[in-house]
Design a protein with these regions (language model features):
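Alpha-helical structural context detector biased toward long hydrophobic helices
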Residues: 1-259
Length: 259
């Protein structure tokens, strides 16, 4: 049976970007290929029928999406003031790092590299290749894991009137004090933040109160998506995507490699 699978960005994150003012609670998204701004259900956006097998779907649910869903729910409640404090446990941090690694593995860039270098890819079905890349990729150890081991997990809180957007790629890199940080938006007002251990925030939160910083972060979101997939950037606000749409002609050619 072919399942309608989220290729990369899981529904447990995407649903947090629904437009709550919309009676249908759909997600706004910018198609970075066409520049069109459209709406779609979070259950359908970024999906492909038969992309993963039932076994592949269970693998992602057990290893990534179920633990991530619990963490993102807590982050969202903290951002909206529904809970007074937020603690990131060692298990939470491990789950967040697995999410980032999984995003690398599930990108179009990773799939293209596998198809280019694998001696068996051409003899297997696309679905089998996707499943194998998921299983072996998540269990492998290489430069991605080495870099993630040197980072601590914090939470970024958006205290501005602007909204964070999220790429299909799940995360993006930003540079602070000449050091790369990983940002993975999980709701319009919050993101998972990975930074070098020596720069980690006391109390495990970093607060952004300048709307210009959020605008810059959203541009990095667009750049990351252009680099890894060239698919879409999603938001709960059409306004944020209208602003990014004006950046598209500039960023198509100027976004340099961020990997």
């Amino acid at each position: 049976m072919n399942i309608n699978s989220h290729v990369q960005l899981p529904n447990c994150v995407l649903r947090n970007f629904r437009d709550e003012t919309d009676p249908e609670k759909k997600v706004w998204y910018l198609d970075v290929q066409t520049g069109d701004i459209l709406r779609k259900s979070s259950k359908k956006l970024g999906t492909c029928k038969g992309y993963y097998s039932e076994t592949g779907e269970r693998f992602w649910a057990e290893n990534i999406e179920n633990p991530l869903s619990i963490i993102t729910h807590r982050i969202q409640k903290y951002c909206t003031g529904e809970i007074p404090c937020l603690q990131i446990s060692a298990d939470d941090a491990d789950a967040c790092k697995r999410y980032i690694k999984a995003a690398f593995i599930r990108s179009k860039m990773a799939e293209d590299e596998m198809n280019k270098h694998s001696v068996t890819a051409s003899t297997c079905t696309e679905q089998s290749n996707h499943d194998m890349l998921a299983c072996f990729g998540l269990r492998s150890y290489g430069p991605i894991e080495s870099n993630l081991e040197k980072m601590d997990v914090s939470v970024l809180i958006n205290k501005t009137e602007r909204m964070l957007v999220v790429p299909r790629n799940c995360f993006y890199l930003v540079t602070s004090q000449d050091v790369p940080h990983i940002v993975a938006p999980v709701c319009p007002k919050g993101a998972i933040l990975l930074m070098p251990r020596e720069m980690a925030c006391a109390g495990m939160t970093a607060v952004v109160s300048d709307p210009n910083v959020i605008e810059e972060m959203n541009i990095w979101t667009l750049c990351s998506e252009l680099e890894f997939n060239s698919a879409f950037v999603a938001a709960n606000s059409r306004t944020e995507l209208e602003l990014l749409k004006y950046e598209l002609p500039l960023r198509h050619d100027t976004c340099s490699s961020i990997v």
